[in-house]
Every structure is written in structure tokens, then in C-alpha cells.
From Swiss-Prot:
It comes from the Bacteria. The gene is atpB. It comes from Thermoanaerobacter pseudethanolicus (strain ATCC 33223 / 39E) (Clostridium thermohydrosulfuricum). SUPFAM superfamilies: P-loop containing nucleoside triphosphate hydrolases. InterPro entries: ATP-synt_VA_C, ATPase_a/bsu_AS, ATPase_F1/V1/A1_a/bsu_N, ATPase_F1/V1/A1_a/bsu_nucl-bd, P-loop_NTPase, V-ATPase_su_B/beta. Transmembrane segments: none annotated. This is V-type ATP synthase beta chain. GO terms for molecular function: ATP binding; proton-transporting ATP synthase activity, rotational mechanism. GO terms for biological process: proton motive force-driven plasma membrane ATP synthesis. Keywords: ATP synthesis, Hydrogen ion transport, Ion transport, Transport. It holds the Pfam family ATP-synt_ab. Produces ATP from ADP in the presence of a proton gradient across the membrane. The V-type beta chain is a regulatory subunit. Belongs to the ATPase alpha/beta chains family.
Length: 459
């Protein structure tokens, strides 16, 4: 039997303190009935004796401590999941936002999930083709990996996220592929862009969207990624699908976490973020992976905007510790008109070696990748030298490397927003670029691969 309390002592920001409670549990779902009969939801953050601290998902605007009725439901927050969620748009708490009917759930799952037993985890493998050369060719995404994108304010990470969601696929697999898209704290224009882009391209049919707008309560953002991951776990482990989870913008999520921490008067950590930020982010990122004996998998691409483009900021810093690499967007490339402005040199996919090579992409992929990295790095050095000493100071070989760097950015990194390159096209562009350099400079590629794949100059 549900007990109803009218003993609300205090409301501060998104938090409510309820007194004289019994049998209340941490993370328990709470229903708050206002004086007008409106029902709002919350979650127990802390229990101390007969007092419970409740986090309000819809905010505290309009609440009066004298006429609130609080009910503790006896279970944690759950999401009703079903295969019918594919093709639908929900808000940050899993309620339909697309004016469609409510989902009839096949089952209800706790949004906090269950940790995967480390011994039951299967090592990430298998190449995921995103259709973007700078990722597929140089910083390969592998099924079961968590690979974040570090962006900056004003950079086209929204377009990149939509493009990956449209184009991503596992080659040669008979399992179905799905995309779960979680957006936190985005503007109405961004939400409209995502929804219309998914519908226009038909990507909506294999996608589930959870959208928390900037004018929605900030506290709702804490639940949004967990709603998305709960849906992803159902599709992956119950329906045997390969699921790609794209979460944007994790910076907004962390700001919401800081807001709740400040309201609780907790001792702040770096830059005012709570000391448990690392642990909290890990509860989200570590829900990616594969399980032995299961066909399905969850691959994550969290996207975050680095405040002031600072890689040492706590959010990108801690994210980098938990995840398996990072894709970094460059403001300099963006100013040159290059899309996507992926800076390939500081970017890294730690598991790329597990998803490339014979039987996965192509035998020459690893050698070609190493040669492109080395040549582009030397080309950038040559261009920097030319700025200081003048182009006349460069050797003929350095001039070729400088030309290679420009061509690499213009032809390999840059591509249209609607351009879906196969891995064969990406590798072909890479080999074509290497014709700019003398064969003697191709020291990182085996001779048999050069003979087999390097086109003749002038072809």
C-alpha cells in the first residue's frame, strides 16, 4: 500500500525535503501531487533517518509546501520498452514527443541498468562503417567501443552526429542495426533539425530519439542518457541488434549534475563540479560493450563541447580516462571551410587495430593508415617551417609533403554532409594521395601493398 505524506519541509531549486517518512529507499521513484491535481515525478537522492531528499524531474516551479502530497512508489524509475519504440521520438523522461500513442511495453526496466560482469564481457571487434573517411580510415570505430567526439561551441557536431546516425552500418553482419539518439539541453532549432533530418532520410525507421530541450527542466537531463541506454540494452540483448548510442551534449548533462550538487550544498570539486563526476560518467559510458554468447552489442559515441576549447577541462579530461579514445574537431579546419573538421593527429581510437585488416576491412588498411598519419604530420611541420622561414627554405621533398597536407585536408578529411563513403573509397583516396610523394618516402607500407594498390602517376 502506498503511503502519502504531506510533511514537506523545504523546497530548494530542484530538491524537496520530506520529513517523517518510513521505509523509503535510495533511488526510489516519487510522485508529487500539487494543489491543482498535477502529478510530477522525482527520485530519492538521499535518506537520513526519517528524512528523504527528493530530486524533482519537472522542476519545483509552482509548488507550495503546504498543499503538496508526496507518494513513494516503492520502486526505482523504470522505462517501458518495446520493439515498437523504433521510429519514435520521446522526451527526456521517455514520454512520446511525436504526438504518437503511448508505447505498450513488452517489459519495464530500471533505467540505472545492471553492471555487466567483467568476465562476461566480449572484446570489442568488427568494423563499423560510418561513411566518414577521417573516422573509418584513420580512427576506426569498432563494435562495442565507446568513442567520444570532443567539439567546441559553434562547430558542426550536430551535423556530424546526424550524418553518423544516418550512415553507420556493420559490414557483412546479418544482425539488425539500430541507432538510439539522446539529446540533452539542445535548442528547439537543433531538435527540429535532428527530427526532420532523420525523417527526410528514412533513418528514423531504425532509430529511437530521446530529446531533452534547453527549456525543459535541467534535472531531466540526468535521466535522459539512462533512458536511452536502457532502450539500447533492450534492443541489443533482448532483440539481438547492433545498437549505436549517440549522446549529445554531455556537457549539458554535467552542468545539470553540478546544479543538483550545488543545491545539495555538497563540497565542490574541480571547477565546481561534484567530486563524483568521474564515477557518475562511468555509470553511463561503461554500459557500452558486448556480452559473450549474445549477438547484440552497444557502441557509444558521446559528444561534448569543450568549454573554451579546453581539453584539460574536467568534462573532456574525465571522459578521456573512461572511454577508448577521442575524435577532436578543429576550429582551424572549420575556418578553412572543411567539413567535417576532424583533426586527425590528436584524435585516437584505441581499439582501431581490432577492427581493421584482412577479413574486416582490407589487408593494407593498417599500413596505409600509418603512412597517411606520418605523411600528414610531416606536411604540417613543413607548412609551419614555410611560415617562419619562407617557402624557398624548404627542400623539394618538404614542398611535396606540404602539398600532400593541403590535398589530404581537401580530399580525404573534407567531404559533403550527404556523402557516404565506403571503406574501399576511403582507402582508394588514401592511396591516390600517396602518389604525390616519391615511392622512396613510403617507408611505412610494405612493398607488396605498394605494387598492388598504389596507382600509377597520371592515372
Amino acid at each position: 500500500m502506498l503511503r502519502e505524506y504531506k510533511t514537506v519541509r523545504e523546497i530548494v531549486g530542484p530538491l524537496m525535503l520530506v520529513e517523517k517518512v518510513e521505509g523509503v529507499k535510495y533511488n526510489e521513484l516519487v510522485e508529487i501531487e500539487t494543489g491543482t491535481g498535477e502529478i510530477r515525478r522525482g527520485q530519492v537522492l538521499e535518506v537520513n533517518g526519517d528524512k528523504a531528499l527528493v530530486q524533482l524531474f519537472e522542476g519545483s516551479t509552482g509548488l507550495n509546501i503546504n498543499d503538496c502530497k508526496v507518494r513513494f512508489v516503492g520502486k526505482s524509475i523504470e522505462l517501458g520498452v518495446s520493439i515498437d519504440m523504433l521510429g519514435r521520438v520521446f522526451d527526456g523522461l521517455g514520454r512520446p514527443r511525436d504526438k504518437g500513442p503511448m508505447i505498450i511495453p513488452e517489459k519495464r526496466l530500471d533505467i540505472n541498468g545492471n553492471p555487466i560482469n567483467p568476465t562476461a564481457r566480449d572484446y570489442p571487434s568488427e568494423f563499423i562503417q560510418t561513411g566518414i573517411s577521417a573516422i573509418d580510415g584513420l580512427n576506426t570505430l569498432v563494435r562495442g567501443q565507446k568513442l567520444p567526439i570532443f567539439s567546441g561551441s559553434g562547430l558542426p557536431h550536430a551535423q556530424l552526429a546526424a550524418q553518423i546516425a544516418r550512415q553507420a552500418k556493420v559490414l557483412g553482419s546479418d544482425s539488425k542495426f539500430a541507432v538510439v539518439f539522446a539529446a540533452m539541453g539542445i535548442t528547439f532549432e537543433e531538435a527540429d533539425y535532428f527530427i526532420s533530418d532523420f525523417r527526410r532520410t528514412g533513418a528514423i525507421d531504425r532509430s529511437v530519439l530521446f530529446i531533452n530541450l534547453a527549456n525543459d527542466p535541467a534535472i531531466e537531463r540526468i535521466a535522459t542518457p539512462r533512458m536511452a541506454l536502457t532502450c539500447a540494452e533492450f534492443l541489443a540483448y533482448e532483440k539481438e541488434m547492433h545498437v549505436l548510442v549517440i549522446m549529445t551534449d554531455m556537457t549539458n548533462y554535467c552542468e545539470a549534475l553540478r546544479e543538483v550538487s550545488a543545491a545539495r550544498k555538497e563540497v565542490p570539486g574541480r571547477r565546481g563540479y561534484p567530486g563524483y563526476l568521474y564515477t557518475d560518467l562511468a555509470t553511463i559510458y561503461e554500459r557500452a560493450g558486448r556480452i559473450k554468447g549474445r549477438k547484440g552489442s552497444i557502441t557509444q559515441i558521446p559528444i561534448l563541447t569543450m568549454p573554451e576549447d579546453d581539453k584539460t577541462h574536467p568534462i573532456p579530461d574525465l571522459t578521456g580516462y573512461i572511454t577508448e579514445g577521442q575524435i577532436i574537431l578543429s576550429r582551424d579546419l572549420y575556418r578553412k571551410g572543411i567539413y567535417p573538421p576532424i583533426d586527425v593527429l590528436p584524435s585516437l581510437s584505441r581499439l582501431k587495430d581490432k577492427g581493421i585488416g584482412q577479413g574486416k576491412t582490407r589487408e593494407d588498411h593498417a599500413d596505409l593508415m600509418n603512412q597517411l598519419f606520418a605523411s600528414y604530420a610531416r606536411g604540417k611541420q613543413a607548412k609551419e617551417l614555410a611560415v617562419i622561414l619562407g617557402e624557398a627554405a624548404l627542400s623539394d621533398t618538404d614542398k611535396l609533403y606540404a602539398k600532400f597536407a593541403d590535398e589530404f585536408e581537401a580530399r580525404y578529411v573534407a567531404q559533403r554532409e550527404d556523402e557516404d563513403r565506403s571503406i574501399e573509397e576511403t582507402l582508394a583516396i588514401g592511396w591516390d594521395l600517396l602518389t604525390i610523394l616519391p615511392r622512396a618516402e613510403l617507408k611505412r607500407v610494405r612493398d607488396e601493398y605498394i605494387d598492388k594498390y598504389l596507382p600509377e602517376k597520371g592515372e
